[in-house]
């Protein structure tokens, strides 16, 4: 092979641009020398440094980068608060429950065991803001996610399928159907959102009315295989979505992985950030988690869990503690004199 160019190129996802995206015509520059052309290849270490630099600004990889869905929802949240202030309406229609000395209200959602129903609602709301507040100029589209080219049902796709934004309830019903049929957990929903934002960042695409279902389906498919111990097979999704083929599911999964650059790792810090940002999104949109008064049984359970964690922490500190020897018990190796003739 050497410096020669190989004719064997791996198949990549087909790109399609909308009316807003135009490609400039390619004009070859005859003044370029041989060193400035393809023979001057970039070293792999340089590419790794660039990837590390970009990763710091990618919310799905770096815990300090703010999530995309939360930033996209800020405009709508400010408009809602402004309209409520102008119309002199209270900020929330649902009366909030506040804890007192005698009663403590807690929800049953934790970072390790989130509430399934409300987590799916929050993820659907995050996807809704992604679609609603997408780039107005339009970005690159991929054929594998186009519902007109790869329909999920045999019913005819309407001609204006890419014009109308889906409602939050429609997104919620689609995600809930997949999670209920496949018996997926709430943690899988959070990982689904991580993969979705990672896809939008890596592939530099937008989620829109034409592709949101297949993007969400691909993210759920991948998250269920990575997160759950008993992964759902592609043929199982074909039984849920009756009109889709196994070959289409396999191709969707393959191209989704390629666009993610096979980066399916989700650090615990990134997972926790997405969980708490989803809670912030729910609070800003009056989508509060169900609160229940703290009962005696639940208090004993929380106390037992805290004691267990405290005992584990003490054991770790005890095992990590270094032991020092005193001068009384200190023994040094003795060397016997050697005679060199």
UniProtKB/Swiss-Prot annotation:
It is a lipid-anchor. The keyword Transport does not apply. SUPFAM superfamilies: Cyclin-like. Gene3D superfamilies: Cyclin-like. One of its GO terms (biological process) is Wnt signaling pathway. GO terms for molecular function: cyclin-dependent protein serine/threonine kinase regulator activity; protein kinase binding. It is found in: Cell membrane. CDD domains: CYCLIN_CCNY_like. The keyword DNA-binding does not apply. The modification Phosphoserine is found at residues 21, 25, 33, 71, 73, 83, 99-100, 102, 280, 288, 295, 324, 326. Residues 143-265 form the Cyclin N-terminal domain. InterPro entries: Cyclin-like_dom, Cyclin-like_sf, Cyclin_N, Cyclin_Y. GO terms for cellular component: cyclin-dependent protein kinase holoenzyme complex; cytoplasmic cyclin-dependent protein kinase holoenzyme complex; nucleolus; nucleoplasm; nucleus; plasma membrane. PANTHER family: CYCLIN Y, ISOFORM A. Positive regulatory subunit of the cyclin-dependent kinases CDK14/PFTK1 and CDK16. Acts as a cell-cycle regulator of Wnt signaling pathway during G2/M phase by recruiting CDK14/PFTK1 to the plasma membrane and promoting phosphorylation of LRP6, leading to the activation of the Wnt signaling pathway. Recruits CDK16 to the plasma membrane. Isoform 3 might play a role in the activation of MYC-mediated transcription. Found in a complex with CAPRIN2, LRP6 and CDK14 during G2/M stage; CAPRIN2 functions as a scaffold for the complex by binding to CCNY via its N terminus and to CDK14 via its C terminus. Interacts with CDK14. Interacts with CDK16. Interacts with LRP6. Belongs to the cyclin family. Cyclin Y subfamily. This is Cyclin-Y.
């Amino acid at each position: 092979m050497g410096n020669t160019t190989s004719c064997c190129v791996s198949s990549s996802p087909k790109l399609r641009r909308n009316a807003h995206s135009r490609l400039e015509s390619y004009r070859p520059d005859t003044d370029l020398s041989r060193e400035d052309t393809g023979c001057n290849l970039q070293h792999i270490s340089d590419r790794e440094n660039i990837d590390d630099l970009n990763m710091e600004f990618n919310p799905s990889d770096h815990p300090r980068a703010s999530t995309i869905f939360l930033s996209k929802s800020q405009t709508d949240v400010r408009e809602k608060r402004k309209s409520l202030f102008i119309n002199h309406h209270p900020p929330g229609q649902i009366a909030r429950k506040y804890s007192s000395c005698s009663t403590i209200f807690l929800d049953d959602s934790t970072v390790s065991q989130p509430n399934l129903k409300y987590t799916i609602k929050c993820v659907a709301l995050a996807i809704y803001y992604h679609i609603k507040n997408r780039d107005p100029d339009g970005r690159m589209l991929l054929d594998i996610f186009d519902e007109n080219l790869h329909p999920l049902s045999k019913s005819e796709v309407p001609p204006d399928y890419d014009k109308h934004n889906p409602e939050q309830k429609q997104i919620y019903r689609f995600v809930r159907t997949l999670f209920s049929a496949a018996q997926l957990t709430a943690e899988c929903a959070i990982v689904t959102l991580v993969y979705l934002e990672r896809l939008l960042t890596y592939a530099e695409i937008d989620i829109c009315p034409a592709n949101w279902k297949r993007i969400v389906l691909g993210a759920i498919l991948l998250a269920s295989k990575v997160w759950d111990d008993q992964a759902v097979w592609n043929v199982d999704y074909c039984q849920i979505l009756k009109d889709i083929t196994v070959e289409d599911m396999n191709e969707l999964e393959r191209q989704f992985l390629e666009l993610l650059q096979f980066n399916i790792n989700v650090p615990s810090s990134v997972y926790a950030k997405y969980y708490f940002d989803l809670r912030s999104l729910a609070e800003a949109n009056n989508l509060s988690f169900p609160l229940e008064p703290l009962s005696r049984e639940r208090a004993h359970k929380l106390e037992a869990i805290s004691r267990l964690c405290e005992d584990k922490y003490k054991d770790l500190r005890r095992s990590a503690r270094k032991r020092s020897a005193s001068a009384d018990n200190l023994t040094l190796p003795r060397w016997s004199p050697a005679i060199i003739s």
